[in-house]
Amino acid sequence: MSTPGPVPSSTSVATLPFSAQDKTQEQVSEELQSVGIYQDLERYEETIQQLSKSVDTFKPDLSLIDKVIECDKKLYETLEEFDEYYKIEEELSRLDKEQKNIDNKTREILETLNTCYNSLNELPMLEQVEFEQKVMLKQREKIHSKVVLDYAMKLAKFTRFPPTFDKSMIGPNNFIWPAEDSLRKGMLAMASLKKKELLLDALDEDNVNNDNNTSKIDEMRNTNEDSVDDRFNNKEQVQDATEDTERRGSFEFTANGKEDSETKSEENPDLELDLDLDLFNPDEF
């Protein structure tokens, strides 16, 4: 009677797929190998393979069964740690989301910083702006008013008049400044808008002028009175002096009375006329 050969059993442990992707130990990453449960699974797999080989060769090894039991106990112990691994996985997923959010925010910040940097580069430097301002001020100082007026005349002659321009307005239409009539109208309009202020200013000026005039009139009156008194006194002194001289001349007797009379008649022709009159006849006496 011949012994039967090894028949593959459907329940053989060697035929079970230990991993869905049938990865070898070399293909597994080092990070996965560092996990304790993965090492226990590998050890459990190796012992089961050895046991299956011994059973297939009809030489079972009982020590392998003890190893399988030990590996099974370790697997149960590591399975109890799955709760911690689950928590760790949740924490990792949360950190991944947070990292993504931070990455998005940092990307947005970098984009805004880049746009700000570009806009700042487009702007001129402070030193350049100050230099340009100084140059412009120097150029403005050099420009003469006549040049500005000539340029304004050119603009006024060759540009269109505004739609609110009054064609019936008197004055030069080609000038950019208004005519004299429009200036007067503007002054009258401003005066009509500020009636009260102008009236109050005028009244204040009139009051001040009246006070000054009254003081001047009083001074003039006082000076006139003083001058009249002085003149009256001078006239009295002159009259007194003339009376004294006339009186003194009537009592003077000179030897050459004829010569004196002739000199007096030469000096005053009116006296000569009086002497020529025959007011009385000396023969009658």
From Swiss-Prot:
One Pfam family linked to the record: Med4
Any single biological process term in GO: regulation of transcription by RNA polymerase II
Biased composition (Acidic residues): 268-285
An annotated GO cellular component: mediator complex
Parts forming coiled coils: 31-115
Positions of disulphide bridges: none
Main location: nucleus
Molecular function per GO: transcription coregulator activity
Compositional bias (Basic and acidic residues): 216-250, 257-267
Keyword Transcription: yes
Highest rank taxon of the organism: Eukaryota
Disordered, as annotated region: 1-25, 206-285
Record has Transcription regulation as a keyword: yes
Biased composition annotated in UniProt, kind: Low complexity: 1-13
Keyword annotations: Activator, Coiled coil, Nucleus, Transcription, Transcription regulation
Compartments where located: Nucleus
Subunit structure, as described in the record: Component of the Mediator complex.
Record-stated family: Belongs to the Mediator complex subunit 4 family.
Purpose: Component of the Mediator complex, a coactivator involved in the regulated transcription of nearly all RNA polymerase II-dependent genes. Mediator functions as a bridge to convey information from gene-specific regulatory proteins to the basal RNA polymerase II transcription machinery. Mediator is recruited to promoters by direct interactions with regulatory proteins and serves as a scaffold for the assembly of a functional preinitiation complex with RNA polymerase II and the general transcription factors.
Protein name: Mediator of RNA polymerase II transcription subunit 4
Organism: Kluyveromyces lactis (strain ATCC 8585 / CBS 2359 / DSM 70799 / NBRC 1267 / NRRL Y-1140 / WM37) (Yeast)
